[in-house]
Amino acid sequence: MVDSSSYGLLQYFQKLSDEEFQRFKELLQKEQEKFKLKPLSWTKIKNTSKEDLVTQLYTHYPRQVWDMVLNLFLQVNRKDLSTMAQIERRDKQNKYKEFMKNLFQYIWTSETNTYMPDRSYNTIIDRQYKALLDIFDSESDPATAVVLGTRGKGKTVFLRKAMLDWASGVLLQNRFQYVFFFSVFSLNNTTELSLAELISSKLPECSETLDDILSNPKRILFVLDGFDYLKFDLELRTNLCNDWRKRLPTQNVLSSLLQKIMLPECSLLLELGESSCSKIIPLLQNPREIIMSGLSEQSIYFYCVSFFKIQLGVEVFKDLKKNEPLFTLCSNPSMLWMICSSLMWGHYSREEVISSSESTSAIHTIFIMSAFKSIFGLGSSKYKRFKLKTLCTLAVEGMWKQVYVFDSEDLRRNKISESDKTVWLKMKFLQIQGNNIMFYHSTLQWYFATLFYFLKQDKDTYHPVIGSLPQLLGEIYAHKQNQWTHAQTFFFGIATKHVITLLKPCFGNISFKTIRQEIIRYLKSLSQPECNEKLVHPKKLFFCLIENQEERFVSQVMNLFEEITVDISDSDDLGAAEYSLLRASKLKNLHLHIQKKVFSEIHDPEYGSLENFKLDQKFSAINWTMLSILFCNLHVLDLGSCHFNKKVIEVLCNSLSPTPNMPLTVFKLQRLLCSFMTNFGDGSLFCTFLQIPQLKYLNLYGTDLSNDVVEMLCSALKCSTCRVEELLLGKCDISSEACGIMATFLINSKVKHLSLVENPLKNKGVMFLCKMLKDPSCVLESLMLSYCCLTFIACGHLYEALLSNKHLSLLDLGSNFLEDIGVNLLCEALKYPNCTLKELWLPGCYLTSECCEEISAVLTCNKNLKTLKLGNNNIQDTGVKRLCEALCHPKCKVQCLGLDMCELSNDCCEDLALALITCNTLKSLNLDWNALHHSGLVMLCEALNHKKCKLNMLGLDKSSFSEESQTFLQAVEKKNNNLNVLHFPWVEDELKKRGVRLVWNSKN
């Protein structure tokens, strides 16, 4: 039987005579060739019924079926059917549009409330509207657009307007036949569905069949909002599906749609907030951004004169503009609505409801108080408190369950009656969403959920869903972004004398000291070294402290932390960091990342008006100047991946320069890290901070240094006041010429550890360094030269240096093309008794087993060499056998041997086992990434269990072995308390000594 979704086509087939139907099938063969489709065999078509042919067409050609059929109707002289089908399809599409128009007209007028004429709103969103048209201007290519912006900036309102305009016939008419709008958080309680079911839920009864609708996916747009409130993780998945009919877990359906596995030719328009942006964008294909940057001054004016009568609106606007902090809040549409609503109530009650400087929490409180007074008047505070508490319980239960749409059972369970619901709707605390209820704005749910904890009493009934305050604080500060991300500011904002005083007339005494104590207690636990949980997003905390603004409490919180890592992405972030960090008197270590946008000198219209850009520049400069005051008191300043301009560098220099009131002896800075820094300047910064007597460590990894800047650096290092001992200049684009400059200056410096990894020094650069090493004044102890484009020729220079240098103990030559001939030269130097080298790193140097004879000779005669790393070389079993002979020699003193990734097999395990038992000094052996099997592992484990084995670290990836082998290793570890079997055992130490750092992201 034909599927009901395909009935639309069948009804036209029924109107064909048998002769016409037969002719239709014959022509179908040619039509398949015309459309370049894989043909259905004639045997399948010849005797098939009309019902079966419909099924076959939709199965094999779902996207071309109507184009083919309409064309074939013409060829069998049934133009009437072709015309009739087109008219009927168009009528059904228009009926869907009409249905959506009525629905979104109701949503626009009843639930959106922009409080301004459409022409004024259209002026406000003109830039975003043009961006939308530009993205979807193509007639055929699928596109993905994301509407971005902080909370309350009008993203959902913009999408609703776009949906209404499409349904009204004024937007993207030639581009999309169907536009579907879904608030994805409404699916939070749906565990399984199909895309077909999801679409069907939006279709009126008179619509086309799903097969017909989806037969042309390039003419379909999905509008999706509410990702911030979605409780599913829509991560990159491999278990995706392209079948829109198939029922799947809800997150799989959404992921399949977003990742273009399901209906890849459709287009997407998504609303993403702060929480969801970083999670969803990686799933999308070539997303283009539409930025909602908030209301301009002109837009605020439009809003005020529309919300109030014109004369009163003008007066309100003027008053708001005089109040700069309040006017700043007005750029957020939801905040402007609350402010105007409160002012309207104050106007009619002849009360001054908003003072000169109010926080977001205070604005919400004033709005709620105004609404309560207008409805409940002078009723008892006990009664009003009871009513408020039911609303707060609904809100907090929803937050913990990640529910934002409530049904009648949710209201009943939380003691909200029908009459209560009517009151809350009138007060604009709640709004109707279809057959359900939502909070009027998401921030109201966050506010009421937070207020629950202030109203909570010990005698209250236990609620199994609602977590404790410490649990909630853990969700906010120690875990990934979640549904509580935006609510956190209200905890700090309500916990102020001002807000509690505002609440008192309506709801009686409310204590906030207990909440503050809980916050302090929890944050203190995060700051302890032994605590497994850490402060993941300090920026969240900074904005909370700005919301609080009570100096004593803010200082009390910030003084809990000695180390903080923070990412600064815009001017607001910098202001929040400046406010909070200046109150952290116990702060010692600051890791600061400043993104390009913060100090950019080029205006990008995507991020707002030129006027706002200039204001941001002004405030960023002021905040940076203030923030830099604390640098002199830090022990560690990490400016990794910071984007600076010339003026910012000047401020940084000034902050680290001595003054009559701030002599050099007062500065505490010991470690400075400037990795991957842009616009580093001309090097004058070195002359400033290298004077600081406490500064011992400087890391510039990934920051490009010209020859002139290198010369400035070296000149400063040579200065008598400079005390730098560790200098890490990896990946700084230092040439062999710059290396020559450096070698000349470093001879008389105090530098003991020098890393030049990942620089194109070449053999010529090493020649200069070796001249430095041969100078008796050189005190260098560690030299890191991995990835420096060296060959065996460099080893000839190093040979001479090793013979004469009395201080060098660590030499890293990893990942250079040294070959056996180069290592043999080094071995000749190591055989001399006066060679002081203790560690030699040679991983990835293109060595073979041939060089192991010379290395073995070194191991048996050199008493100083304690560490030898030969990983990632073609040593093989034959080479290891020679090395093991040396390890068994009584004069071998090596303690640490790296043989990871050396193409070893079981054949060398017997030799290794003997060496483990015989060598009294060997403490660490790395065999990671070698193809050892169970039998070889058994031999090693037997040796590890031997009483003469001194090994305390074995490098192996336990997870790569069979279950039986893993059991063996676990048993050995259990028996030998001092033994650790580790994967990548030395990576952390190697990166630290090389000074290698990662480009900043939120995880490092």
UniProtKB/Swiss-Prot annotation:
Note the InterPro entries from the entry: DAPIN, DEATH-like_dom_sf, Leu-rich_rpt, LRR_dom_sf, NACHT_NTPase, NLRP_HD2, NLRP_innate_immun_reg, NOD1/2_WH
Query: Do the record's keywords include Metal-binding?
Result: no
Keyword vocabulary terms for this entry? ATP-binding, Cytoplasm, Immunity, Inflammatory response, Innate immunity, Leucine-rich repeat, Nucleotide-binding, Repeat
Q: Where are the LRR repeats?
A: 750-770, 779-800, 807-828, 836-857, 864-884
Q: Name one GO cellular component term.
A: cytoplasm
Expression across tissues: Oocyte specific.
Q: Using the record's annotation, list all stretches that form the Pyrin domain.
A: 1-92
Molecular function per GO: ATP binding
One GO BP annotation is: blastocyst development
Q: Please list the residue ranges annotated as the NACHT domain.
A: 143-465
Major localisation: cytoplasm
Query: Where, subcellularly, is it found?
Result: Cytoplasm
Which residues are recorded as binding ATP?
Answer: G149, T150, R151, G152, K153, G154, K155, T156
SUPFAM superfamilies, per the entry: DEATH domain, P-loop containing nucleoside triphosphate hydrolases, RNI-like
Q: Which domain of life is it from?
A: Eukaryota
* Pfam families reported for this sequence: LRR_6, NACHT, NLRC4_HD2, NOD2_WH, PYRIN
Matching entries from PANTHER family are given as:
NACHT, LRR AND PYD DOMAINS-CONTAINING PROTEIN 12, NACHT, LRR AND PYD DOMAINS-CONTAINING PROTEIN 9
What this chain does, per the entry, is described as:
May be involved in inflammation.
Regarding protein family, the annotation reads: Belongs to the NLRP family.
Q: What is this protein called?
A: NACHT, LRR and PYD domains-containing protein 9C
Q: What is the lineage of its organism?
A: Eukaryota, Metazoa, Chordata, Craniata, Vertebrata
Give the encoding gene's name.
Nlrp9c
